[in-house]
Amino acid sequence: MDTQRNILLLALALVSFLLFQQWQVETNPQQPATVSTVQQTHKNGDVPTSSTANSDAPVDSAQSDKLITITTDVLTLKVDTLGGDIIESVLNKYDAELDSKAKFVLLKNDADHSYIAQSGLIGPQGIDSNTGRAQFTAKKTDYVLADGQNELRIPLTLEKNGITYTKTLIVKRDSYAIDVEYTVNNQSSAPATVEMYANLKQNLLDDGGSLTMPTYRGGAYSTEDTRYKKYSFDDMEDKNLSIDMTNGQGWAGMLQHYFASAWIPRNVNDATLTTRVAGDYGYIGVRMPSVTIPAGQEDTLTATLWTGPKLQPQMAATAKYLDLSVDYGWLWFIASPLHKLLSFIQSIVGNWGLAIMILTFIVRGAMYPLTKAQYTSMAKMRMLQPKLAAMRERIGDDRQRMSQEMMELYKKEKVNPLGGCLPIVLQMPIFISLYWALMESVELRHAPFFGWITDLSAQDPYYILPLLMGASMFLIQKMSPTTVTDPMQQKIMTFIPVMFTVFFLWFPAGLVLYWLVSNVVTLIQQTLIYRALEKKGLHSK
């Protein structure tokens, strides 16, 4: 087993990994929605049916004639006074495209796509139903979080049948979490029973992943019993979920690359997570238990909406397991610490590209004992080649005897035949973990390195890094002694750097940078190890 065969093994592992990711995308397709007209914010099916009897009494179904704009340092929201739904969220610190003046819009409601956050009250004294939504009034149409102000409250009010309903949206500085409070002041002569719900509504969309950048767009949720689970639009079409959220713990959300929206119930001992499909829309959300408010009293029901980038520390502080929406796959236990280390390094050096380079040196340094063992094992195997050749000549076609004597020779010479490839196999989880850590890090979105690399999350526009990476692989091959004599195998080995280069043309520049620096470290380590082996007589140029 030599370096070139290890490279072949690595190539096969990488190809298998990429094909597996693409298989996941293709075996979990989402059906694209056909939208020919402007989508309305409210339509039949938006409001769930209450568990309380007589819940679908008609309410005011007047169309909205006013939108409210709420601006903070990180968010610009548009709220429809009909229902008080958030129909648009603009992320003020994230450009829509690199160097674009327009900001990224997460929630929106237009002709091409509808993705909004709904909440309301249902039940006998509820103000929302499938026949109409509550028409709130507000004192202003524009609310701005002023400099030095840490919190802003936006009240929407409605009076009906002796009951005052106040829906208050609470935004805070440097926060993508929005608290939504329903205060029900019952000044009627009878008890009032209401039930709060909070949904995310979105068109049924195709996942949109690719071979080199598999992404997920669909639902996800967390409960006390299930820390994190994706629930795609196809899943919603197949089965409506209704899951008890023990102790009111958990969240229901919709995810996409780098960004997420999620509803979190607050201050309840029980809640229900629900999904459904109505027409061209998928819904995922939470339902709070019904509350009965005696005459002359009031009560408040609360939920929190996260609508923003997948920033793990802030998400973890907002809701338990919400940070798991940054999905590192089955190697999360490796990827998560790597991301934390990468973020720590970046906080010191101030550049994500430099942080990736330093992280590469740290990872490769930690794996140096494996690398040294790999090259030492390969050198010993090469030293045994003359004896193995003589053994084959002497034994002939008796495979059983050949295998037996080979194992005896390995034992006598203290050589592990798998010692050359095992370190490569052990390194693959590191590569895959780094792949997901870089792929899922919103911090790398539009993050520059230097020169022509202005976005580490996108491919190199001039393909310079992939070409340098391919050249470094070619140098590693040329510097590595080989026992491969079969012409076909030699051609395959020569083709491996070309194949890797082609694959990496469309990989994010940050990942290609990691691989390039890793190859440079390999060349340095290879030179040092070979010099040490030469002194021991285990390697010859």
UniProtKB/Swiss-Prot annotation:
One of its GO terms (cellular component) is plasma membrane. Keywords: Cell inner membrane, Cell membrane, Chaperone, Membrane, Protein transport, Transmembrane, Transmembrane helix, Transport. The chain crosses the membrane at residues 7-27, 343-363, 418-438, 456-476, 495-515. Residues 34-55 have a biased composition (Polar residues). Belongs to the OXA1/ALB3/YidC family. Type 1 subfamily. The lineage of its organism: Bacteria, Pseudomonadati, Pseudomonadota, Gammaproteobacteria, Vibrionales. This is Membrane protein insertase YidC. It comes from Aliivibrio salmonicida (strain LFI1238) (Vibrio salmonicida (strain LFI1238)). It is found in: Cell inner membrane. Required for the insertion and/or proper folding and/or complex formation of integral membrane proteins into the membrane. Involved in integration of membrane proteins that insert both dependently and independently of the Sec translocase complex, as well as at least some lipoproteins. Aids folding of multispanning membrane proteins. GO terms for molecular function: membrane insertase activity. The gene is yidC. It is a multi-pass membrane protein. The keyword Cell inner membrane applies. InterPro entries: Membr_insert_YidC (IPR019998), Membr_insert_YidC_N (IPR028053), YidC/ALB3/OXA1/COX18 (IPR001708), YidC/Oxa/ALB_C (IPR028055), YidC_ALB_C (IPR047196), YidC_periplasmic_sf (IPR038221). It comes from the Bacteria. Gene3D superfamilies: 2.70.98.90. HAMAP family: YidC_type1 (MF_01810). It holds the Pfam family YidC_periplas. Residues 34-59 are annotated as: Disordered. One of its GO terms (biological process) is protein transport. Interacts with the Sec translocase complex via SecD. Specifically interacts with transmembrane segments of nascent integral membrane proteins during membrane integration.
